[in-house]
């Protein structure tokens, strides 16, 4: 039996609730656990395997730009993915609403892709803040060690 509109509303509502809950928990853990912790070593290659810090330009500016882009893309995917899915299904002659199984997986993917981009954007922003704070501490330490001139 095809999926009814009421079932779609329930599935989408539950999925959005789970996505927002996961995003809130992730943001809280970033703050409460202070990830990445400045006492621990942070390996860019492990934590951000697709980010190349040697590609040129200021790392903080690029991280903040990439964080914003990921968050914007995550928000845009919430609206673009259903359109693409419907277009692709019609193009291939499939019915998205024909199977509960297809609908569940489609809605799960629809929410997982934006959620992963939101989380990536938050993490990159947090890393940019960590680097900014570290630079400020280093500049303050150098300024404190600078020779003082008597006037």
Regions found by a protein language model. Give the residues of each.
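Alpha-helical transmembrane segments of multipass membrane proteins
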Residues: 22-26, 77, 81, 85, ...
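Membrane interfacial helix-start motif at the N-side
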Residues: 54-71
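Alpha-helical transmembrane segments of integral membrane proteins, especially early/N-terminal helices
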Residues: 1-2, 30-40, 78, 141
């Amino acid at each position: 039996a095809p999926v009814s509109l009421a079932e779609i509303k329930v599935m989408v509502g539950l999925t959005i609730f789970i996505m927002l809950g996961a995003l809130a928990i992730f943001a809280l853990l970033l703050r409460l656990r202070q990830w990445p912790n400045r006492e621990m070593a942070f390996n860019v290659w492990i934590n951000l395997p697709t980010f190349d810090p040697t590609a040129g330009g200021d790392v903080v500016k690029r991280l903040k730009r990439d964080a914003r882009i990921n968050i914007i893309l995550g928000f845009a995917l919430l609206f673009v993915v259903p359109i693409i899915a419907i277009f692709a299904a019609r193009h291939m002659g499939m019915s998205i609403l024909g199977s509960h199984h297809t609908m569940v997986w489609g809605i799960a993917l629809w929410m997982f892709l934006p959620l992963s981009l939101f989380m990536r954007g938050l993490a990159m922003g947090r890393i940019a803040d960590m680097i900014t704070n570290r630079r400020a501490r280093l500049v303050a330490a150098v300024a404190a060690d600078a020779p003082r001139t008597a006037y």
